[in-house]
């Protein structure tokens, strides 16, 4: 096993990461970094976090053998890590609990968040209700349209949802607005970022709160198959569910890590969100990473059927894992993801989120070419209730 200790003291993963923000945010980030570095080694904080994961979220989430599908494909065995079974229906809540507990310790009564698919917004609104905090969620107006049921869920949980009409009206624009709010209300507000992006300490902090996924797998897989899997596959937008399952496996060199980006309508069309495959190195939302840019270096509009993957950047640790060769990254199109969504419903009785369907589609592509003793572990990062309207629309149905 190879030791792995990134980021460095300045929040860099090789040339990626770091802190690229306005001077007005530096004090808030220094304060956050100090609080997080203290809490992450504080036994009482760790105990409280683990208690909430068990009793509020319902962890550990199980691993499940997709046996009928594996048999049909006739190759490798596919297993799912069932993050869809968490309270609120996705992996997002793991991180939200960690950051909300941190906000409470820092004496910040108001939390804000950005959201794309709405899952992070719902998870943030949920923990804000749990701890009696004021909550404001920024969401691109295009995503508000795509994810109407999640918008209503957030409102039911007591959150204020602010639609963002600038730019492409999606996740990156919501993130920009949330950053502006944070600068304005820095004294009483904690910004709960939903993915492994943003300025340090966010990429490592979100990763650390999500590594519970992979840590559970390290224990669970030997219990069910007698060893670790050969492949670990996860969808990558910003990349938090993938980092959560990848990170504990990084030292296991015989386990191949495969991230799956949104190839949208096809890589050749330019209508996709695969920043690792097609982006250039740039700075976005406070960190250096791969960014979808046009010839002038402006952030390019992205496309994916999945709102949660529709982001023009990617977490800096993924950029480093790609360059170092420790992880590989593939692309799955809208059509391939939708086919996997339908097949998963019919064959396994599980309705995955469209984000997770990208990872499942990649596993289904790989399995037939591999021998039956190989094992692919897929992070089924969320459930698909939120995507009913999108899937129905694509099938020409009106719900």
From Swiss-Prot:
N6-(pyridoxal phosphate)lysine PTM positions: 92
Keyword Lyase appears in the UniProt entry: yes
- State the superkingdom: Bacteria
- Cellular component annotations (GO), alphabetically ordered: cytoplasm
Q: Which reaction does it catalyse?
A: (1S,2R)-1-C-(indol-3-yl)glycerol 3-phosphate + L-serine = D-glyceraldehyde 3-phosphate + L-tryptophan + H2O
In terms of Pfam families, this protein maps to:
PALP
Q: Does the keyword Amino-acid biosynthesis apply?
A: yes
Cofactor(s) of this protein: pyridoxal 5'-phosphate
- CDD domains under this entry? Trp-synth_B (cd06446)
Q: Which Gene3D superfamilies match?
A: 3.40.50.1100
UniProt keyword annotations, A-Z: Amino-acid biosynthesis, Aromatic amino acid biosynthesis, Lyase, Pyridoxal phosphate, Tryptophan biosynthesis
Q: What is its EC number?
A: 4.2.1.20
What InterPro entries does this protein's entry cite?
Trp_synth_b_CS (IPR006653), Trp_synth_beta (IPR006654), Trp_synth_beta/beta-like (IPR023026), TrpB-like_PALP (IPR001926), TrpB-like_PALP_sf (IPR036052)
Molecular functions (GO terms): tryptophan synthase activity
Its pathway is: Amino-acid biosynthesis; L-tryptophan biosynthesis; L-tryptophan from chorismate: step 5/5
SUPFAM superfamilies documented for this protein? Tryptophan synthase beta subunit-like PLP-dependent enzymes
Family affiliation: Belongs to the TrpB family.
Q: Subunit comment for this entry? A: Tetramer of two alpha and two beta chains.
Q: What does this protein do?
A: The beta subunit is responsible for the synthesis of L-tryptophan from indole and L-serine.
Per its record, how is this protein called by name?
Tryptophan synthase beta chain
